[in-house]
Design a protein with these regions (language model features):
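Extracellular/periplasmic carbohydrate-active domains that bind, remodel
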Residues: 1-141
Length: 141
């Protein structure tokens, strides 16, 4: 599991206020909470760009197959995205597989997300979110 995060707390593999040029390719994730995840801190500044998820298979995911949020504060989501850390030039391609029925297939909560490439993705088995906001052109929730 690889998380991209641009806020101040947490134990993640990539921890910077500027995250750029990150390829996550040809992976299989099973029995995890989340698979494709980018989260940024509420009210923070920085950027996330040129991130590529390609050929990711998910199985038995408890919370989210794909989750991208711009609303984290003190380790929890606020539900209100902020735009200080734009998420741009993201490619999510061939992310396929299943979430648990109690999980959510895709959740996107953005205030400043653009220039995404979203192709051949099919996360199934979980719920469809009705709380997505700011979904970039071409992506789907």
């Amino acid at each position: 599991m690889i998380y991209l995060r641009t806020s101040d707390k947490g134990n993640y593999r990539i921890f910077q206020h500027v995250v750029k040029t990150v390829p996550i390719l040809h992976s299989a994730i099973s029995s995890s909470d989340n698979v494709v995840r980018i989260k940024t801190g509420s009210g923070k500044t920085g950027s996330v760009s040129d991130v590529k998820y390609d050929g990711i298979t998910l199985t038995n995911i408890a919370k989210y197959g794909i989750v991208i949020e711009q609303d984290y504060e003190n380790g929890s989501p606020t539900g209100v995205p902020t735009s200080g850390v734009p998420i741009t030039d993201v490619t999510i391609n061939k992310v396929t597989g299943t979430a648990k029925s109690s999980g959510t297939n895709v959740y996107i909560l953005c205030a400043s997300c653009k220039n995404w490439t979203w192709t051949n993705n099919k996360a199934t088995g979980g719920k469809k979110s009705d709380k997505c906001k700011g979904v970039p052109t071409g992506a789907s929730c």
